[in-house]
C-alpha cells in the first residue's frame, strides 16, 4: 500500500480524503491540528455531531485507510517516509517549507 500524507482536513482535504480512501490502495495519513467548529459545517464535509472533535479523528473514524495525526506540520522531517504529500491548506509558512524540500526525496502536490 502506498503511503500518502494529506496536510489539511478542511475545505479541500475533507472532500479529497473519501475519494482517496475509495481507491483502497493507499494508507492515508491526515495531518491537521484543527478542531471542527460550527462555522465549518457549511463548506467542509463535517456534520453537527463532529463539532468539537479533531478533524483528523473524524476522518479516521469514517474511513478505514485513514490514520489521524492531529498535529501541525512544522519540519521537513515530518514530510519524510511518504510516497506522496498533498497540501490542502492555505498556510503560507507550510507551503514555503514544501517549496524548499528536495523533490527527489519528497513528491508533493499543492492543491491550493
Where do the language-model regions lie?
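Adenine nucleotide-associated cytosolic modules
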Residues: 1-112
